[in-house]
């Protein structure tokens, strides 16, 4: 199974988010899965990458050519992308399930882009697991409900999103995706 992980590249992250990234990465690696991610060598990207590899998993980094100087040299495979849009497209095509860890606008962009992509595909097996730790994604989830309430979004699309509030719950949802 190939699991995309979207997460922050910032280095000044609170310890609780680092621990969550480590837990998810450890789960991925210990289940012989392959992680597909942004491929960079800093922030939660580096944390989750290290946890996957230490636990026996493999990692595929998808890196825009313009920022390749920051890529993680420990990636098992690196795929270069023309730009950020190409990176997202490649990650979506390579992955079976998508995990969105707490992050900033980049992670939010990846989540929304993936959600939109999945809404136009008939393959309902692909899911998004949103780690809503400390309610970090509450506002976007509320906005989706507003769109549903105003008939701007099909409520059935929300079935593609599984919401976890802890790394442990995220791993339980990942296990369900293996079935």
Regions found by a protein language model. Name each.
Residues 1-57:
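Glycine-rich beta-alpha loop segments
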Residues 8-11, 65-67, 103-106:
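Short glycine-rich anion-binding loops that position phosphate/pyrophosphate groups of nucleotides
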Residues 42-100:
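Acidic/glycine-enriched connector segments
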Residues 62-63, 101, 117-141, 155-157:
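Short, acidic/small-residue loops that bind anionic groups at enzyme active sites
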Residues 86-122:
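Active-site/ligand-binding-proximal alpha/beta "capping" segment
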Residues 97, 150-179:
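A charged, well-structured terminal subsegment
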